[in-house]
Design a protein with these regions (language model features):
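Single conserved hydrophobic/aromatic residue that forms the stacking wall/gate
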Residues: 1-14
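Active-site and ligand/interface coordination hotspots across diverse enzymes
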Residues: 13-54
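Active-site histidine-anchored catalytic micro-motif
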Residues: 19, 89-181
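Short coil-to-beta-strand
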Residues: 33-43, 79-91
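Extended amphipathic ligand-handling, pore-lining, and cofactor/metal-binding catalytic surfaces
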Residues: 52, 56, 77-79, 97
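Short catalytic helix/loop segments, enriched in acidic residues and glycine
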Residues: 58-71
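Short helix-capping segments at alpha-helix termini
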Residues: 72-79, 148-154
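Domain-level recognition of soluble alpha/beta enzyme cores
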Residues: 176-184, 188-193
Length: 193
């Protein structure tokens, strides 16, 4: 197989250049006449991932998982999902914040971003949102509870992609950051990175 010439080639080769499920590569012409059942929001952080992974690792991986989930939902259940562009604003722990270009986002800022997204989707008739979280510092439970008061008929669910399976069943030395798990998943989605 020839070597990839860029991210677009990787997306095409792996089937991720799907304008019907991925808003990052879609256009109004592809989505305007389709009805979407669920919006999927990848959420990560901007932070160093050791010396070998990109700063946006959490976003890249949660986006890849979200696209896979959207494609599976369509194929297996006939559910139309749209994957939103990933949010790169995460909550950071002290000790991490001092590292160059590590961006910390306060709870209030994250809540404001989520509120604006929910409010936009609500006006457009979408009533279901799944957050695919890729960063351990992010917590959405309180935000979701607060939003349910203002939007009682809007369902929001959140899942950390890295907790769905027991990593110890698949990896010899799992850790929790820039480890064997994140490195392997990055190699799956974007070997060129």
């Amino acid at each position: 197989q020839p070597r990839s010439r860029g991210l677009g080639d990787v997306y095409k080769r792996q089937g991720y250049m799907n304008k019907e499920v991925d808003l990052s590569v879609s256009c109004y012409g592809k989505v305007k006449d389709r009805k979407y059942d669920i919006a999927i929001l990848p959420w990560g952080a901007t932070e160093p991932h050791n010396l070998h992974l990109p700063y946006m690792t959490d976003c890249i991986l949660s986006h890849g998982v979200a696209v896979d989930a959207a494609l599976m939902a369509k194929q297996k259940y006939g559910v139309n999902c749209m994957v939103m562009p990933p949010i790169g604003m995460g909550s950071q722990n002290p000790g991490q914040r001092e590292l160059p270009f590590c961006i910390h986002t306060r709870y209030e800022t994250q809540k404001a971003i989520l509120t604006d997204i929910v409010s936009s989707l609500y006006v457009q008739g979408i009533r279901k949102l799944i957050i695919i979280n890729g960063h351990g510092g992010n917590t959405f439970k309180s935000m979701i509870r607060d939003l349910s008061v203002d939007y009682p008929d809007f369902l929001i669910a959140s899942s950390e992609w890295y907790t769905v399976l027991k990593v110890k069943d698949y990896f010899e030395n799992p850790g929790d950051h820039a480890d064997e798990v994140e490195t392997s998943v990055m190699m799956h989605y974007h070997p060129e990175l």
